[in-house]
Amino acid sequence: MSFLIVANWKMNGMRSSFVDFIGKLNNKSNEITSKLVICPPFTSFPSSIELNNNIDIGAQNCHHKKFGSYTGEISAEMLKELGCTYVMLGHSERANEKDSEIKLKSEIAIESGLHPIICVGENSEDYKNEKTKEVIEYQCKNRLPTHGEYTVAYEPIWAIGTGHVPNNDAIAKVIEVIKLCTSKKHIIYGGSVSSENIENLLSISNLSGVLIGSASLDFDHFYKIIQQVEKKFSLINSKISN
């Protein structure tokens, strides 16, 4: 699997800005080998937008039931029909979600043909009390599905939108903790990822991708991150071929 770059737009961006953003990405696609997943608000889903092969659309949530009387919710099957291939689950900004509910959502997503990106991460209190390992193990045990393909996103809650990022050793250790909980190899990092710190993050050998929040809203900033990723893997591939 290629290096995964996920853009979480949260509740930002009108459909017109999304169409413009995707158009710019399509124009640059011959320069990009990474897998890009753009997660816009539901209102921007691409009913008639042409996407190049390395660009996928993801949702920011889905319900844990296929259909039913759940006002204001959207099912994984509906997302699939709209053209989604990924769905992000368990983000800390989705307040008060239970771990068991996140697990049900991930399983119904897989059953519906979506690839879930399941978020795990400790809050500031757990981080200060050195309970990160304990929290991550518990979340993995209770959030991750028992079958199918998925990606785990380590996103420490205290790092989201703060500009603060754990040091590389700390991130690498958490990735190893997650790997002991699952046979899946696709583990990405999220939390204040930007063009200023992506080069440093790319030196983490067991990192499979990044989850980007506010830095993905501006195309130029987002593309700077992509360029640094491409440069890194171009150099690696060059060394391998030589």
Curated annotation (Swiss-Prot):
**GO annotation terms (biological process):** gluconeogenesis; glyceraldehyde-3-phosphate biosynthetic process; glycerol catabolic process; glycolytic process
Instruction: From the Swiss-Prot or TrEMBL record, state where the protein is found.
Output: Cytoplasm
GO CC, one annotated term: cytosol
Report any Pfam family annotated for this entry: TIM
Q: Which UniProt keywords apply?
A: Cytoplasm, Gluconeogenesis, Glycolysis, Isomerase
> Active-site residues?
H91, E155
Q: Which reaction does it catalyse?
A: D-glyceraldehyde 3-phosphate = dihydroxyacetone phosphate
Binding annotation for substrate: N8, W9, K10, G161, S192
Gene Ontology molecular-function annotations = triose-phosphate isomerase activity
Q: What are the EC numbers?
A: 5.3.1.1
Q: What is its main location?
A: cytoplasm
Pathway, per UniProt? Carbohydrate biosynthesis; gluconeogenesis; Carbohydrate degradation; glycolysis; D-glyceraldehyde 3-phosphate from glycerone phosphate: step 1/1
Please give the InterPro entries that the UniProt record associates with this protein.
Aldolase_TIM (IPR013785), TIM_sf (IPR035990), TrioseP_Isoase_bac/euk (IPR022896), Triosephosphate_isomerase (IPR000652), Triosephosphate_isomerase_AS (IPR020861)
Q: How does it assemble?
A: Homodimer.
Q: Which family does it belong to?
A: Belongs to the triosephosphate isomerase family.
What this chain does, per the entry, is described as: Involved in the gluconeogenesis. Catalyzes stereospecifically the conversion of dihydroxyacetone phosphate (DHAP) to D-glyceraldehyde-3-phosphate (G3P).
Q: What is this protein called?
A: Triosephosphate isomerase
